[in-house]
């Protein structure tokens, strides 16, 4: 009744675990509500819907730049879909920021006057995020300090030449334990990703964080370059021991 009153779509009487297993992988799935047409028309609608990361990111990103905090921006945030959440966390940290749309160019970043760049999380397969990947390569080449979260982490890794691949079991939820390899400290973190980076034991990066659930890489720092990534989302602040300190560390000199 509460869902109906709020106009919120819900589902009941369905084995959601079985549904998740069926939909896992590369299957294209459409969810329809209300009055629907013949199945053949629904299938055609799903097939005709663009599913590339560039399309998904552009829909989720801000359409116009906007400022967060007082003063000249110290940080430029590239909004790949979760930019607003990241901007709010940056604001609370006291660092003025300029949030740029996913379509921003390196010239836009340079013109912002910001000394550091954050790549937010967002939707889609990182291998298809060609616009964001091009920007990331320019940022890395210019040696601007940059930190990516979620999709941003994956795109930075690809900009450094690493491959990404689907996880056997996607990470979603607000209770994933992640351990910092150097200190052994464990944070309970928010995850929203279906892909992981294959660092393949490369000497060019240091793996800083790992998942305690499946051992996958959850953070890296590039050796000799001011580039770092976190596969999880400190800005979503899950759990009693959230990971805001990792973002604060990046911002402290901003």
What are these regions (language model features)?
Residues 70-75, 183-186, 222-227:
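Beta-strand-turn-beta hairpins that frame and shape the catalytic cleft
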Residues 185-224:
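Catalytic beta-strand/loop cores that center a nucleophilic Ser/Cys/Thr
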Residues 9, 74, 145-147, 163, ...:
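Proline-centered loop/turn at the N-terminus of a beta-strand
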Residues 111, 116-194, 239-250:
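Cysteine-nucleophile active-site neighborhood
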Residues 78, 100, 167, 210, ...:
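Hydrophobic residues at beta-strand termini and immediately following loops
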Residues 219-254:
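A glycine-centered loop/beta-turn motif at secondary-structure junctions
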Residues 1-95, 100-103, 107, 112, ...:
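RNA-binding accessory domains that recognize and position tRNA/RNA substrates
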């Amino acid at each position: 009744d509460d869902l109906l009153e709020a106009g919120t779509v819900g589902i009941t009487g369905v084995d959601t675990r079985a549904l998740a297993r069926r939909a896992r992988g590369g299957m294209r799935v459409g969810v329809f509500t209300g009055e629907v047409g013949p199945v053949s028309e629904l299938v055609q609608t799903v097939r005709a819907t663009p599913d590339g990361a560039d399309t998904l990111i552009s829909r989720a990103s801000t359409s116009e730049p906007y400022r967060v905090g007082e003063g000249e921006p110290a940080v430029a945030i590239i909004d790949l879909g979760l930019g607003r959440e990241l901007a709010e966390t940056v604001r609370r940290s006291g660092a003025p920021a300029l949030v740029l749309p996913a379509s921003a160019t390196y010239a836009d970043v340079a013109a912002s006057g910001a000394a550091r760049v954050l790549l937010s999380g967002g939707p889609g397969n990182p291998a298809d995020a060609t616009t964001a990947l091009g920007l990331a390569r320019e940022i890395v080449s210019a040696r601007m300090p940059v930190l990516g979260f979620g999709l941003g982490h994956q795109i930075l890794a690809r900009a450094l030449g690493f491959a990404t691949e689907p996880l056997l079991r996607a990470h979603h939820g607000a209770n994933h334990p992640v351990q910092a390899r150097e200190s052994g400290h464990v944070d309970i973190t928010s995850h929203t990703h279906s892909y992981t980076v294959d660092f393949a034991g490369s000497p060019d990066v240091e793996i800083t964080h790992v998942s305690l659930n499946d051992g996958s890489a959850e953070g890296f720092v590039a050796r000799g370059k001011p580039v770092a990534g976190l596969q999880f989302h400190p800005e979503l602040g899950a759990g009693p021991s959230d990971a805001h300190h990792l973002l604060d560390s990046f911002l402290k000199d901003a």
